UniProtKB/Swiss-Prot annotation:
GO terms for biological process: cell adhesion; homophilic cell adhesion via plasma membrane adhesion molecules. This is Cadherin-related family member 1. The chain crosses the membrane at residues 706-726. It comes from the Eukaryota. It is a single-pass membrane protein. Residues 1-23 form the signal peptide. It is found in: Membrane. GO terms for molecular function: calcium ion binding. Residues 24-705 are extracellular. SMART domains: CA. It comes from Gallus gallus. Residues 792-805 have a biased composition (Pro residues).
């Protein structure tokens, strides 16, 4: 029962499925015609130049029940697969390149399926032609044999080319390249090659012609563009010879020579003639027509001409022979002939070369002794040379030439006929130099000009030179630079200069001397050139560290040259630093340093660099000193006198320090000094006067003396000015009236209350002390009659101003020391420090070359010694 329940639903479903299957209809393609791009691909045409990968068609069909359909493409067995299809969309794509020339139709089986039924159709796709083929020549290569007597316009060959394209792309036309240079023409359609009208072929001029033929198709579409293809081939046209040209002599004109020693029967020359028809040449027969006069004969077959008489029997100097060359056919007939003229000259034998002669006969070596540098244009009269050629006419003509160092001498004459006297002339005097050549050697060459033998001969010429004093001694350098330490003992070597004179003997000996403003301390050895110091000389870099002077190199004839010597005296640490005073006193304001100074008289660093230090102080640890500048200041924690009072019980606030000045030389020198420092605080009294009073507080008479001296100078200046004005007016014989009155400006009460008993109130500028007013009563003489009242006496010189009044004060102001920053002035240096000048401050190792140029620039315009 259970199985029956399951069977009934299954049977029902099977019946429903059978009903549905029986009701299904097969799908089908749409037939849209030959020009349609969708359907079943029937009658589809594709150009062979369609690119691979192109979408060429769309399969399109439907199912009557409306079910979705799929598409397929299949091929016969062994066929190439040109297309692929998208099963769902039906898009057909070209996957293989088409070639109509190989396959012009493609069979494809297209199918459509709705999943239950499949419908297949076989369709043919036509491959359309595109112009993708070039013309091709057949039966190549083309070689044509053409007789040279072929008439113009005749056909000689037919050229054929094929193009596998159809239509205009397969049609071919022919033409020739370089048509203007060709002797041929071609029919454009048939390809028949002809000799151009009015043109003949000539084997003797050109045996082969190469004709380039171009075959071009009619053009057509290829991938959307019009394309025209062409091909070229070369036709070789060989011209065949025919007997149509007379013989030709080669090597004309013909010249022969019979010499005085020629034997009878000797061959003079050979003439050669060839048949003008080179392809099948005939034999040539030679004969002398006239001009021989029984003296010459010719070989009938070879063309060799021989003399049959002795040269002594020949009556003429020149013979003109007329020779005939005839073509002889194989049958023995003379078909053509030609003539040539042969010139034979009877000449003397060139059997004598040019020969050089001296005073005693033939000679091949000539010698001469002379001084160097003779004048240009001078003739070497010591050479007696004659040259001769015993032949006659052209055989006796030759050229002369000097072979050797060029441009020194020239020979006259250059061309000689038979005989001449040889003259050698100086051309370059400077090159005739004993120092370069002790002996000048040349070869005198004589060589024939117009003879085939070119006979020649040579003679050796040796010129021994004698020396003259033609050279100036020359230093090895234009300047010499030397260094020597100061304090070197007298007679110390400084530098050695060297000069050479290439002249020989005494002229080559050099003596040295020195002179110049800087040469006082130096001597030079006259032979060796060693420069050394005077025995008594003391070199001190602090006095002078630079010397320069000239050295002179002179030969025995007085010829000389100069060089400049630069000597630098190197500094040695030989001075100790020196303070300006052994015991110094300084007043120090709290917060302001005081400075000490010591001078080291050495010329160079580091010998003259001074370092300062405090050797001893009581109490210690109160002062600091700057090692380089010598500034002494209090420790940073000392800011008032109260702190100082706490340090020491000395209420005077005076300290004694032992300071040291030490140079940086090697070995080092040092100097010590005792310095007393009076410490005070800053007050309101400032300025130069306050500083002066502070310096002279212990010597009030000195202050009064200085003030009195200043006022006396002012009075003296006023009197001198007034006297000068008086004498000027007196010399002019009149005293001009004063038109402007100078009045003293009203002084205002000074607002300065500080140091009234020490200072004057000074205006801001000198012009504020006086004002100028015009005099109301002018003394001008309006009548111009010299009736002028006596001029008033000029005012007397103003008295010096009264001394300033002391400021009244009820309270006695406590004595305050103004701020004073003192420095020690160097004491007078006894070692000619002032003479040292600016040069002593320079570094002693300044470049000597730079100093040379500076000195030379400074001395420009002065005559050179």
């Amino acid at each position: 029962m259970k199985h029956v329940r399951h069977f009934i639903p299954s049977l029902f479903l099977s019946l429903v499925h059978v009903c549905l299957v029986q009701a299904n209809y097969a799908p089908y393609f749409f037939d849209n015609g030959a020009r349609s791009t969708n359907g079943n691909m029937a009658l589809l045409s594709l150009s062979e130049d369609t690119p691979v990968g192109s979408h060429v068609y769309t399969l399109n069909g439907t199912d009557p029940e409306g079910d979705p359909v799929t598409y397929g493409l299949t091929y016969e067995a062994g066929s190439r697969r040109y297309f692929s299809v998208d099963g769902n969309l039906g898009n057909v794509t070209l996957i293989e390149e088409l070639d109509r020339e190989k396959e012009d139709e493609i069979e494809v089986i297209v199918s459509i399926s709705d999943g239950l039924s499949t419908v297949s159709e076989k369709v043919r796709i036509l491959v359309m032609d595109a112009n993708d083929e070039s013309p091709e020549f057949i039966n190549t290569p083309y070689i044509v044999q053409v007789p040279e007597n072929s008439p113009s316009g005749s056909s000689i060959f037919k050229i054929e080319a094929v193009d596998r394209d159809t239509g205009s792309g397969g049609s071919i036309t022919y033409f020739l390249q370089n048509i203007h240079a060709n002797k041929f023409t071609i029919d454009r359609h048939s390809g028949v090659l002809r000799i151009k009208s009015g043109v003949t072929l000539d084997y003797e001029k050109s045996r082969t012609h190469f004709v380039v033929v171009v075959a071009k198709d009619g053009g057509g579409k290829l991938r959307g563009d019009n394309k025209v293809f062409s091909a070229t081939t070369t036709v070789t046209v060989n011209v065949e010879d025919v007997q149509d040209t007379p013989p030709m002599f080669i090597g004309t004109p013909y010249y022969g020579y019979v010499y005085e020693d020629t034997l009878p029967g000797s061959e003079v020359l050979t003439v050669v003639a060839l048949d003008g028809d080179r392809g099948k040449p005939n034999n040539i027969h030679y004969c002398i027509v006239n001009g021989s006069e029984g003296s010459f004969e010719i070989s009938n077959t070879t063309g060799a001409i021989s003399v049959i008489k002795s040269p002594n029997q020949l009556k003429k100097e020149v013979y003109e022979l007329r020779v005939q060359a005839s073509e002889v056919s194989p049958e023995g007939d003379v078909s053509a002939y030609a003539f040539a003229t042969v010139t034979i000259r009877v000449v003397d034998l060139n059997n004598h070369p040019p020969t050089f002669y001296g005073e005693s006969g033939p000679q091949n070596r000539f010698e001469l002794t002379m001084y160097e540098h003779p004048p240009e244009g001078e003739i070497l009269r010591g050479l007696k040379i004659t040259v001769n050629d015993s032949d006659q006419g052209a055989n006796a003509k030759f050229n002369l030439r000097l072979v050797g160092p060029g441009g020194i001498f020239r020979v006259v004459p250059l061309t000689v006929l038979n005989e001449a006297q040889v003259t050698i002339i100086v051309e370059n005097s400077a090159a005739i130099d004993y120092e370069k050549f002790k002996v000048l050697t040349f070869k005198l060459l004589a060589i024939e000009v117009n003879t085939p033998e070119k006979f020649s001969s040579t003679a050796d010429i040796a010129i021994r030179l004698l020396d003259t004093n033609d050279n100036v001694p020359k230093f090895s350098s234009d300047y010499y630079i030397a260094r020597i330490p100061e304090n070197s003992p007298g007679g110390s070597n400084v530098v050695a200069v060297t000069a050479t004179d290439p002249d020989s003997g005494l002229w080559g000996e050099v003596k040295y001397s020195i002179y110049g403003t800087g040469a006082d301390l130096f001597l030079i050895h006259p032979s060796t050139g060693i420069i050394y110091t005077q025995p008594w000389a003391v070199l001190d870099a602090e006095v002078n560290s630079k010397y320069n002077f000239y050295v002179k190199a002179e030969d025995t004839d007085g010829k000389y040259s100069l060089a400049e010597v630069f000597i630098t005296v190197l500094d040695v640490n030989d001075h100790s630093p020196e303070f300006n005073e052994n015991i110094q006193e300084k007043t120090m304001i709290i917060g302001s340093p005081v400075k000490i100074e010591a001078i080291d008289q050495d010329a160079e660093e580091p010998n003259n660099i001074v370092d300062y230090s405090i050797m001893q102080a009581d109490p210690a640890n109160v002062f600091d000193i700057d090692q380089s500048t010598g500034e002494i200041k209090l420790k940073s924690y000392i800011r008032s006198l109260d702190i100082i009072h706490n340090i020491t019980k000395n209420k005077d606030c005076i300290w004694s320090l032992v300071v040291q000045a030490k140079d940086r030389g090697s070995p080092s020198f040092s100097t010590t000094a005792v310095l007393k420092i009076d410490i005070t605080e800053e007050t309101l009294h400032k300025g130069p006067m306050a500083a002066f009073l502070m310096q002279t507080k212990d010597n009030p008479m000195k202050a009064l003396g200085v003030l009195a001296g200043v006022m006396g100078i002012m009075v003296l200046i006023t009197i001198m000015i007034s006297t000068a004005m008086f004498w000027r007016n007196k010399r002019s014989n009149k005293i001009m009236p004063v038109r402007r009155i100078i009045k003293k400006r009203q002084t205002q009460q000074s607002r300065t209350v500080r140091m009234e008993w020490l200072k004057f109130k000074r205006p801001s500028n000198a012009a504020e002390k006086f004002v100028v007013e015009d005099d109301a009563k002018s003394l001008q003489n309006e009548n111009s009659n010299n009736n002028v009242q006596a001029a008033p006496v000029p005012p007397a010189a103003p008295l010096p101003p009264p001394p300033p009044a002391l400021a009244a004060s009820g309270n006695t102001t406590a004595w305050r020391v103004p701020t004073v920053s003192g420095s020690l002035t160097p004491k007078f240096i006894n070692k000619q420090l002032k003479k040292r000048g600016h040069s002593s401050t320079h570094n002693a190792l300044v470049s000597e070359l730079k100093m040379k140029f500076e000195k030379r620039n400074a001395s420009m315009g002065e005559p050179h010694i």
